[in-house]
């Protein structure tokens, strides 16, 4: 995993670039915003476990204590089909009924600005998903975690989104039927339709470039609104630079 939780087998640390702010009234560190937007997918058999992990449920409840982590927000389920009373049921059904070798879920892992308040981070994520997940009616769950870097001690807020490509079209189906193959002649007889991420794009690579650029623009708009500049000291001089990110800096 990209974001390291002390005490969890999740190798690889991450810290934001630290710049010192030189002000007579304050000597605190400030951070340039950082860009991280990874896209992963997992086959059936992993969805329920991952939902429990990001939601810190059952066997993962102890992570909060061992890693000194804050779970800032959990959205258990949006755009869920009618058979779902608890999102656990949806992800369990994906593991049980998805076809062999089918993707049970896609995950977006997104770094969030630690100079934002938890409420601002939540709004930042919600408004992005309202544009890029909700219109397709992808059933999804997400959580915002904040864990301190083992290297710098700074906050590392980030979001884990997981969603199914089986779009909720509002037709009543059982859990088993929902994951069957789509029937274009009579949708009520088959499963929900899979809307592939690359639909409307030349190919999957084109989609990845598009969605990462969309996050860059979305985050930069919010940075311009809430914390547009960063000031630091170089050779005794205060230098103020624009606080913005670039998807081009992201190591794929």
Locations of the language-model features?
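N-terminal nicking endonuclease/strand-transfer module with a His-rich metal-binding environment
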Residues: 2-252
């Amino acid at each position: 995993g990209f974001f390291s939780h002390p005490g969890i087998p999740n190798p690889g640390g991450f810290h934001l670039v630290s710049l010192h702010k030189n002000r007579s009234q304050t000597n605190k560190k400030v951070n340039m915003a950082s860009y991280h937007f990874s896209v992963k997918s997992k086959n059936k058999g992993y969805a329920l476990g991952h939902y429990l992990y990001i939601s810190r449920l059952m066997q993962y409840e102890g992570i909060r204590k061992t890693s000194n982590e804050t779970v800032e927000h959990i959205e258990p389920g949006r755009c869920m089909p009618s058979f779902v009373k608890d999102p656990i049921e949806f992800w369990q059904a994906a593991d049980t009924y998805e076809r062999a070798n089918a993707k049970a879920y896609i995950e977006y892992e997104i770094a969030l600005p630690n100079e934002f308040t938890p409420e601002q981070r939540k709004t930042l994520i919600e408004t992005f998903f309202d544009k890029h997940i909700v219109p397709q009616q992808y059933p999804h769950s997400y959580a915002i975690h904040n864990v301190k870097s083992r290297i710098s001690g700074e906050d590392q807020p980030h979001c884990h989104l997981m969603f199914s490509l089986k779009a909720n079209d509002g037709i009543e189906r059982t859990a088993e039927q929902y994951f069957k193959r789509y029937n274009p002649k009579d949708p009520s007889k088959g499963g929900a339709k899979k809307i592939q991420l690359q639909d409307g794009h030349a190919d999957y690579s084109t989609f990845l470039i598009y969605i990462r650029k969309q996050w860059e623009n979305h985050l930069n708009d919010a940075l311009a609104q809430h914390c547009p500049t960063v000031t630091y000291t170089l050779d005794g001089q205060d230098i103020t630079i624009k606080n913005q990110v670039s998807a081009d800096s992201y190591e794929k």
